[in-house]
Amino acid sequence: MPGWQALRAELHDKGLEIVTIGLDAGGADAVRPWIEAANPEHPSLIDETHIVDELFGVTNVPNAVWIDEHGMIVRPAEPANIEHSPLQDMEIPDGLPERIHDMLVEVKEIRDDSEAYRAAIVDWVENGADSPYALSPDAVVARSLPRGRDESEAAACFELGRHLHDAGDDDGAVTWWREAHRLDPNNWTYKRQAWSLASTAPGEPSDLMQGPTDLYEGNWLDDVKASGGGANYYPSFQP
């Protein structure tokens, strides 16, 4: 979040606006502390239903969609890191619990395209439609993730789970969220939402480790390993 605030401050006078969206079924209570800590000058929204998944093809965070001054999408949802994570440079200390050690190993392997991605945004702001990073409508469609039957059913299952969760039926929510995970196993936002709700104690901040529970077959670390490790967690930036 600080990186996006800094980028906005740098380029807002040239026409750039940043809108951040927190995906969290916990709503304002879950997201507000993060927004208040960042104290952003740009709009910060909350998406309790993960509607941006459904509308724009978001499957992980952070993702971004570029929309020009005419309201046209010029880059579809894609990984959107603009700051190098210090975790990737840290030396992993000895004596850590095995699971935390293994998680840090995978985090250090996550692809870092932050410098190139930030430079692409700056180029777009400077050059508009002439920027090589502003895609044609056909290219936007070609790069957008397909929405097949399984992905559509997964979106419906996730929404059913969220409705039951809001109604206090946690067991019912888990059933439908498990089905969403089965139908769309590459959607990390569905998984991470369910895992964090399952592993976060009442009244505590969201559990970012999203470790194993009895409710779901997967968890962050094991699913990352199963997908080929941290290097495959985000697809590479495609100019």
Whereabouts are the PLM-identified features?
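Sec-exported extracytoplasmic/periplasmic mature domains
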Residues: 9-13, 36, 57, 72, ...
